[in-house]
Amino acid sequence: SLDIVSLTNADNFSKYDAEDMPAMREKGTKVLYQVDYAGRSGELTDETKLGAYLDKVIAAVEKNGLDGYSFTGIPNAGDAATATAAALIVERLSAAKTEGQLLVFEGNPLFLTEDALSKVDYVVLDTKATENVTDLKMQVLNATGYAGVPATKLLLAAAAGAPLYDENVEEHAAITEMAERVVSLGPLAGLGTYDIYNDYYDLDMNYKLVRNAIQTLNPSK
């Protein structure tokens, strides 16, 4: 199995983050620098600004010994500026990626062109807000069919504390049920978990759910 942590606040990589790196290395965990274009598209629409920001990202990954990059995005829906940004992000980060590093996209795969998709190692589908399995199946079908994402590259996403209703409208914890669907709808490449730290009082429960999900995907773990 391959475990990945995406740093959502990597712009402010601290000495505490650096201190965590040896433990991550020991566990074989890949640590990625997240470029949150979806959340910052308003300030990064200018190609020059985006290029300068990507230069800083690439330099930070090298300086801090990170294992690659993840990035978010939104479907361009014919918007030329967004399409240009998507192409630039993939072009620059894929070119900067060294042997053993990863490039991961988080979001709706329609943000990516066919060429861009070929340069991405994994796609984490934006299913963390999905509440029922019927919608989930449609999202997976659209991703693997219309968007052309190979099942071997596709991960599902689930948020801690979120519900996911099955075909019988029975409620399950999204993290554990989504792990089951990674197997039954594919098998797909894996599961991305979000918001693990958001609920202070349920941290122990969140970790148990993640552990159960890992055991579902990797029974030997």
Task: Kindly give the residue locations of the regions a language model identified.
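Chitinase-like catalytic core of GlcNAc-active glycosidases
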Residues: 1-171, 177, 185-188, 192, ...
